[in-house]
Amino acid sequence: MENLTYITGNYGKYVSVKEKFENAGITIDYFKCDLDEPDVNDIEFISKEKARQAYEKLGSPVFVADSGFYIEHYPDNPGYPGAFVKRSGVSSNVSKLLETMKDVTDRSCYFLDCLTFFDGNEYYQFFGISRGSLSNELRGHENKRAKSNLWYVFVPDNCIKTLAEMTDEERNNRPDNR
């Protein structure tokens, strides 16, 4: 099988995807590229549009991944920031997020991931969800594999550690990551 090309501007995302595919015997090439993101709160649409752009740049089959982060009881805006994680500033200013959420008791949240493969003719999309809650403080150590600063505040369901506190083995073997 020929290699697949993964397009992203986020090296942490690449490392995570590469490991998952290696376990299935598939080699993933990395192509660093920032793609235009449509201004819509729809992960499925955004991922498909990025795959189209990536295919136009490379001229060969590609896949991209996009994620949303949804805080179910964000004050006055349930589901925030959704697909707008980067643009909202939530992932770059996690301390501000914690301050905003300080009086919220139900801290349920989740990541929604969409992986899109485009061969120039057909789109194939795959989805994953990781449910959990926000911690009350930043926790964990710096990790080059971190896809987002939200790793320091996201505690997956049935876990007591944030993603940033977990070892690679703990993160890969948690109940919601199968």
Which residue stretches match the model-derived regions?
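Anionic-ligand binding patches
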Residues: E2-T5, G12-R178
